[in-house]
Amino acid sequence: VRTGDSLPEWHVEATPTFVISTALATRDFQDVHHDRDLAIQRGSKDIFINILTTTGLVQRYVTDWAGPEALVRQVNIRLGAPCYAYDTLKFFGQVIEKDDQDLTIEVVGRTDHGDHVTGIVKIEVPA
């Protein structure tokens, strides 16, 4: 692994079942994550995934690439455009720093509406 290496692209289909089940699994009962009618009444296009799901997807993207021995040390993300039901969330990543056993990965998750999440993940990998 070298600085500048790209991670393989990963796509997540945000089906309504995915949006609702991940919100409930993270105990996020806000109606905008499971009730389409109320989400639309509140000005949203549809239900959308929550921040805990987004954070988990970012971590999974990096650790699936790095392998089971990778240890996540830091996650710093910024949310952008919502990821609505029926969107495809496409993840891209690049190694931006390597130091002994530590890697810093820049991650972007994008839908047709723009960047849903941008961030940095720092991991420790065995030598």
Language model: regions and residue ranges:
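Hot-dog-fold acyl-thioester-processing enzymes
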Residues: 1-71
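Mid-chain, well-packed structural core segment of small domains
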Residues: 62-91
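Hydrophobic residues in beta-strands and at strand termini
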Residues: 14, 79, 123-125
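HotDog/MaoC-like acyl-thioester-processing domains
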Residues: 1-7, 83-127
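Short, charged/polar low-complexity linear motifs in solvent-exposed/disordered segments
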Residues: 26-27, 38-39, 74, 91, ...
